[in-house]
Amino acid sequence: MAFELDRSQILNVLRGFNPWWAGLPMNVPAFRRLAFDQCVRLLEDPKFKRAILLSGPRRVGKTTVLKQVAELLLAGRVEPVSVVYISLDHPLLKLASLTDLLRIYREDIFAEGKPAVLLLDEVQYAEDWELHVKTLVDHHPEYRILATGSAAV
């Protein structure tokens, strides 16, 4: 990190984005777009070793697809903390690197090396996001990654 961010503030933001970690219900629209089924199929395919990127204009439902995927995974009895949603356009999270955010997640929420699903919303706000995601795909097979982006992703 360029300067020391308050770890507890970052954890509070992450916990706010992931109410299922505390056993709280999700409020997600029932209508599912075509992209939902395609994302689920790829995430569940053990041979698929890439990140999935949903790109498109704002307000078309990309975030809803991410949250619906989380809801489906949680209904499948995965460990709730193994599913992490991070909105990278949050003012505080924009100050940290994606690597730092995932390190905090692994150190404070869910142990390193265990399988996890990363739901990265508005990924274009993370500096050098392409390199971070490529590194995660290449060196962390325990991660399944679904990211969204707007504008020039």
Task: Give residue spans per PLM region.
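Phosphate-binding site recognition
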Residues: 1-153
